[in-house]
UniProtKB/Swiss-Prot annotation:
GO terms for molecular function: acetaldehyde dehydrogenase (acetylating) activity; NAD binding. It comes from Klebsiella pneumoniae (strain 342). Pathway: Aromatic compound metabolism; 3-phenylpropanoate degradation. It is an enzyme of class 1 (oxidoreductase). The gene is mhpF. It comes from the Bacteria. InterPro entries: Acetaldehyde_dehydrogenase (IPR003361), Acetylaldehyde_DH_C (IPR015426), NAD(P)-bd_dom_sf (IPR036291), Semialdehyde_DH_NAD-bd (IPR000534). This is Acetaldehyde dehydrogenase. Keywords: Aromatic hydrocarbons catabolism, NAD, Oxidoreductase.
Length: 316
């Protein structure tokens, strides 16, 4: 079976971690080119040491390389603004190329593998939302498949040391993109996202808190749905886990809570507490926020490549 060759744009924390994952665990994918803009970056140096072709001339440099002719997938781990330009350039040069967007640009549909990958297997560009989105949206979706969700709020706390310049430059885009994906993918009527960069030393693991306000429903059914969803995420992010039991609170009709911009709410409040430990392929285990992004992106591209192989076999 022919593996699909991939290029990664962005030689920072996320791009380098993703490269190592593909080299170690790629089933349908083969690492071909690492693209950066800083010739002194550690990511490009590491790629060269691992036998991967590199360029420090950005997307323009990639498209001038002989390897570009065989590239089927491109992962973009740059920034939201850069991705818009990168996608346009790539698509003009190679209209059928598959682009996995790890920035908050969201040109293509949001993709959270355990929730909606099957519906997006044939998209030319998919957006991996954000680290907070990949961790928390499955939990919102787990509740929404049991009861109608009116409001969901997530708080993602990540170690400051794990946030590179790209993450820091995209804080506003992080909150906007995650909030929208909570609604579009998670199924919430209204979504809100908050990110906290925790400067604690030694660095703490990624922690996520998910609050969901829904119609009254069986607490046992919701807890079971959440446990099932957590296990599905663990299939590609082994360090993903529920930190404690799911907490429930019934909000009675005669004592509703007032949500600014939404109105009064009564029903069921569900609180989910998560911890994400990284696989430590490139950065330490506390950087679960990077690990869940790269793991989700790899799972997405692997399934896309598998679908392409199956389709090619069917038409052969």
């Amino acid at each position: 079976m022919r593996k699909r060759k991939v290029a990664i744009i962005g030689s920072g924390n996320i791009g380098t971690d993703l490269m190592i994952k593909i080299l170690r665990h790629g089933q349908h994918l083969e690492m071909a080119v690492m693209v950066g803009i800083d010739p002194q970056s550690d990511g490009l140096a590491r790629a060269r040491r691992m036998g991967v072709a590199t360029t420090h001339e950005g997307v323009g440099g990639l498209m001038q390389m002989a390897e570009f002719a065989d590239i089927d997938f491109v992962f973009d781990a740059t920034s939201a603004g850069a991705h818009i330009k990168n996608d346009a350039a790539l698509r003009e040069a190679k209209p059928g190329i598959r682009v996995i967007d790890l920035t908050p640009a969201a040109i293509g549909p949001y993709c959270v593998p355990v929730v909606n990958l099957a519906a997006n297997l044939h998209q030319g560009n998919v957006n991996m939302v954000t680290c907070g989105g990949q961790a928390t949206i499955p939990m919102v979706a787990a509740v929404s498949r049991v009861a109608k969700v009116h409001y969901a709020e997530i708080v993602a706390s990540i170690a400051s040391q794990s946030a590179g310049p790209g993450t820091r430059a995209n804080i506003d885009e992080f909150t906007e993109t995650t909030s929208q994906a909570i609604e579009k993918v998670g199924g919430a009527g209204k979504g809100k996202a908050i990110i906290v960069l925790n400067p604690a030393e030694p660095p703490l693991m990624m922690r996520d808190t998910v609050y969901v306000l829904s119609e009254l429903a069986s607490q046992e059914a919701i807890a079971a749905s959440i446990a099932e969803m957590a296990a599905a995420v663990q299939a590609y992010v082994p360090g993903y886990r529920l930190k404690q039991q799911v907490q429930f609170e019934v909000i009675p009709e005669d004592k509703p809570v007032n949500l600014p911009g939404i109105g009064c709410f009564s029903g069921l409040k569900t609180a989910v507490y998560l911890e994400v430990e990284g696989a430590a392929h490139y950065l330490p285990a506390y950087a679960g926020n990077l690990d869940i992004m790269t793991s989700a992106a790899l799972a997405t591209a692997e399934q896309m490549a598998g679908a392409m192989h199956s389709a090619a076999g069917a038409t052969a």
